[in-house]
Swiss-Prot record:
Statement: the UniProt record of this protein carries the keyword DNA-binding: no
Protein family according to the UniProt entry: Belongs to the UPF0154 family.
Compartments where found: Membrane
Protein's name in the database: UPF0154 protein MYPE400
Amino acid sequence: MALAIGLCLGLGIPISLIIGAVIGYYFAGKYFKKQLKENPPITESQIRAMYQQMGRKPTEKQIKQIMATFKKNNK
């Protein structure tokens, strides 16, 4: 009887920890990707400011091109 309880605890706890870690990793990755999509690491205004600091006036095409590159790399 005591052996059966010890065996159940000895196998049940590590298996449930592994399953919990896998599920947590999956949902954390999904949440992180959602946050990146909603709040990109750089915005169009930041790109404009970066160009102005370099002494250049960016065209709308350049800004859209840079944003498309960021979105492509985040997928």
